[in-house]
């Protein structure tokens, strides 16, 4: 199960204002099937298809902290 933080939910609108569009499914897929994953402390950094995602695993839920476009 994926949980988007308040900031992560706001990030969709922030990026839309800059004409950068992501769907929730893209963010979730970057975590499920990433091209690259790194870990620093408790946070994981996943990249896939032009999106980077910062998230944290906890029990059954994965908390999505933020996401951003990558080249």
What are these regions (language model features)?
Residues 1-71:
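Ribonuclease/tRNase effector modules and their secretory precursors
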